[in-house]
Structure formats: structure tokens, C-alpha cells
């Protein structure tokens, strides 16, 4: 079984599915000039739990080592990151996933030294680039697979250029995840892209094992990606037009979906026509990831279904027709499972 270490904000201890995958877990804090280990790694923010759930989507049988260094506000200290990496150097895993970064170069040399030692030991390190930045650590180190987000048609797609400073691009399209308070939200950006890449690497290791030149294998699989940079843009998603047939407008469930959207998203009557004309991400509708998550939760409650979270992202639910299609597809899937 592949062992992935996640250095982040911990995991939600009430999520029994993810907790069942944890082989060991602890937190590292900083106090009075020293790093302190504690047998507590409950996620107070949700970020680490999101990363674990993403990795699990690609590699369901993965074993997790959880190291909590980020607090409720997703803040942490470089000293704790360095200590976590030293721990993993002496207690090896297969993949180290770090959906985090620092732009403080105070510990650049010390962080670089331990990353080099880990690389030479054969472990694979993945780190996200800081959002909206060109340089952050440890993503820029030669022995670390630095990841930044991009728009891909499928979650499994990625691009790998080992000769570049930031070697990898993964899908940053926000996907549905469950928060530590049980509500739904969307998780995207470079952090999500790095979790995607960590999960993909874990699945490849599970399938092929650690080869002498894993980089070549990783590069080969990236060649299957078909990226459409010209047509797949945030602008095209937001400004996409919606075509709705008259027959669909008369469908009972479709009418109910419209009512739920208007109520949950608090769309005023004067703007309700936008639901039928464009993406529900249109700026005039003022939809954010929190009330978008409430919408998904309410649809599940009303139809007594459970969406498969890996199917729900801002491409699959970009407008009312795609939400309706996903709803009907989920109904059919759950009916066939009975």
C-alpha cells in the first residue's frame, strides 16, 4: 500500500472514511524557540481534509501519515515544516504532499538542504506554488515537483516539464468537498492542483511501483493530456450561454430545481432570468462557494440522493442545465445500485 504524508492542517477526526486510512498522525508546534510534537491532528480549518479527500479520489487504498503544522487560519512556521521534513527523512514514506508554501527566504537554505536529502533518499515530494506568485518554497527546489493550477477538461489530466522551475500543472478547477462542519464548499487553486498531482503519483506508484526512472513514467502519462487553452478559460465558463428547450422548462423536477436555486441562492426576481441565459457563476448573481455548497446540499436533501463529489466541479455544474443533468444522472446511478 502506498504511504502518502500530508503536511497541512491535519484532518477532520469525525470523518471516519479518511481516518480509517491514517497510519499515524501528530502535530508539530513552535514554542519558546523549539518545535514541539503533540498527539493531536484534528483539522480546525478543513484544508488538510480537502487535500486528503482529493488524494483518496485518485488512490482509494492509500495509507496516510498526517503531520499538522497549520492552524485554524492556515498559518504555520517554517521551523515546523523543516522539522516535519526531518521526521519524514528518518521515517520514510512514498510521497510527501505539501499544499502549502512560504515566500520568506529566511529559512531557504535550511529548507533546501533537507529537501535535497529527501530527494536523494528516493521519496517523491510535491508542493504547491503560492497562488499568484512566481516563486515560493519548497516548490522551486530542484528535487521537489512544484505545482501550479491550470484549467483542464478532466481532473486526471496534467502537464509535466521536469526542466522547468515549477515542473507541473494540475487541475485547479474547484471541486465539491465537505467542510469540517459538515457543510459543502468548493476547493480549488494551486493547493487543490498539488493534491491532484499527489494522488496521481500515488496511483501510478500503486500500479507500477517505484521504477528506476519514475520521472520518465510520470512524463509519459502527462502526454495523454489534451489541454485546450484556447476554449477552456474562466471567462468562457462564466459567460457561457444556456440553451433550454421548452420541453425541459415544463419538466416538474426542472421547475422544482429553479425554485430551489432562487431560494437558496437568494436570487432577486429582477435577476432570475440570468439563470436561463448564462452561467450561474455570472458576477451579477453574486454566487460564492459557500452558498453554492448550500445549493448542492439542498438538492441532495430534496431528492434524497448523494452526489459523488468527484463528479461535481465548476465545469459539471456551470449552469442550470448541467446541474439538472447531474441530478438525473445521480438518480439513475443510485437507482441501479439498489
Model-derived regions: residue spans:
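Extracellular S/T/G-rich loop segment that most often corresponds to the catalytic His/Ser-adjacent loop
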Residues: 2, 8, 17, 134-206
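Structural detector of well-ordered beta-strand residues that form the stable sheet scaffold
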Residues: 65, 124-126
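A cross-family glycoside hydrolase active-site/sugar-binding cleft signature
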Residues: 97-101, 128, 149, 195
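An often Trp-containing, charged/polar helix-loop segment at the C-terminal end
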Residues: 209-231
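Mature extracellular/periplasmic domains of secretome proteins
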Residues: 1, 76-97, 108-121, 132-146, ...
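Active-site core segment of subtilase-fold serine proteases
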Residues: 1-58, 62
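Phosphopantetheine-dependent thiolation modules in NRPS/PKS and related acyl-activating systems
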Residues: 223-338
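Subtilisin-like peptidase catalytic core
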Residues: 37-103
Amino acid at each position: 500500500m502506498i504511504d502518502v504524508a500530508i503536511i497541512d492542517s491535519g484532518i477532520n477526526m469525525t470523518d471516519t472514511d479518511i481516518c480509517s486510512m491514517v497510519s499515524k498522525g501528530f502535530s508539530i508546534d513552535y514554542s519558546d524557540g523549539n518545535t514541539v510534537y503533540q498527539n493531536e491532528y484534528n483539522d480546525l480549518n478543513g484544508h488538510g481534509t480537502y487535500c486528503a479527500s482529493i488524494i483518496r479520489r485518485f488512490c482509494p487504498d492509500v495509507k496516510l501519515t498526517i503531520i499538522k503544522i497549520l492552524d485554524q487560519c492556515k498559518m504555520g512556521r517554517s521551523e515546523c515544516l523543516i522539522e516535519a521534513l526531518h521526521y519524514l527523512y528518518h521515517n520514510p514514506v512514498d510521497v510527501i504532499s505539501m499544499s502549502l508554501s512560504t515566500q520568506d527566504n529566511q529559512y531557504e537554505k535550511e529548507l533546501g538542504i533537507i529537501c535535497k536529502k529527501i530527494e536523494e533518499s528516493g521519496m517523491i515530494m510535491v508542493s504547491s506554488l503560492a497562488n499568484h506568485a512566481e516563486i515560493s518554497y519548497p516548490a522551486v527546489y530542484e528535487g521537489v515537483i512544484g505545482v501550479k493550477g491550470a484549467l483542464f477538461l478532466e481532473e486526471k489530466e496534467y502537464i509535466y516539464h521536469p526542466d522547468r522551475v515549477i515542473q507541473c500543472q494540475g487541475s485547479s478547477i474547484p471541486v465539491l468537498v465537505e467542510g469540517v462542519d459538515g457543510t459543502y464548499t468548493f476547493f480549488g487553486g494551486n493547493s487543490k492542483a498539488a493534491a491532484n498531482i499527489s494522488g496521481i503519483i500515488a496511483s501510478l506508484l500503486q500500479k507500477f511501483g517505484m521504477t528506476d526512472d519514475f520521472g520518465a513514467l510520470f512524463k509519459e502519462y502527462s502526454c495523454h493530456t489534451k489541454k485546450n487553452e484556447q476554449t477552456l478559460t474562466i471567462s468562457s465558463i462564466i459567460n457561457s450561454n444556456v440553451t433550454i428547450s421548452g420541453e425541459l422548462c415544463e419538466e416538474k423536477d426542472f421547475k422544482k430545481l429553479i425554485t430551489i436555486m432562487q431560494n437558496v441562492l437568494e436570487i432577486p426576481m429582477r435577476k432570475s432570468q440570468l439563470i436561463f441565459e448564462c452561467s450561474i457563476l455570472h458576477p451579477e448573481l453574486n454566487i460564492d462557494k459557500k452558498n453554492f455548497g448550500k445549493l448542492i446540499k439542498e438538492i441532495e436533501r430534496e431528492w434524497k440522493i448523494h452526489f459523488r463529489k468527484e463528479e461535481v466541479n465548476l465545469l459539471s455544474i456551470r449552469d442550470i442545465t448541467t446541474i439538472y443533468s447531474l441530478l438525473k444522472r445521480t438518480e439513475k446511478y443510485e437507482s441501479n445500485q439498489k
